[in-house]
């Protein structure tokens, strides 16, 4: 996976780290998460539902936004995770196999 190319396309050029098969980008706060959502919504495609949001555990404390992006014949899964309970926000990017 050419993560630099994907991040550039998503306008999310920020340093992250690998965890298992995902590249994780920690976001500073809910404002940065909102900006990331806007960039993802503009540049990525969710095949089934544009702007589809899943509320984890049927509550609004943790929200996961799911996007897909195709690049060079590969499909990438992108998750924007906002956990309002413990104030953590991050993006996970991985190649769909």
Residue map of PLM features:
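Mixed-charge, Lys/Arg-enriched low-complexity segments
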Residues: 1-22, 26, 97
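Acidic, low-complexity, intrinsically disordered interaction modules
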Residues: 17-18, 22-92
């Amino acid at each position: 996976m050419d993560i630099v190319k994907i991040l550039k396309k998503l306008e999310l050029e920020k340093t992250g780290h690998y965890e298992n098969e995902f590249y994780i980008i920690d976001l500073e706060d809910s404002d940065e998460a909102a900006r990331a959502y806007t960039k993802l919504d503009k540049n990525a495609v969710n095949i089934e539902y544009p702007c589809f949001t899943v509320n984890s555990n049927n509550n609004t404390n943790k929200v996961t936004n799911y996007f897909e992006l195709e690049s060079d014949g590969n499909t990438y899964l992108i998750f924007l995770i906002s956990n309002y309970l413990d104030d953590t926000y991050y993006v996970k990017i991985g190649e769909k196999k």
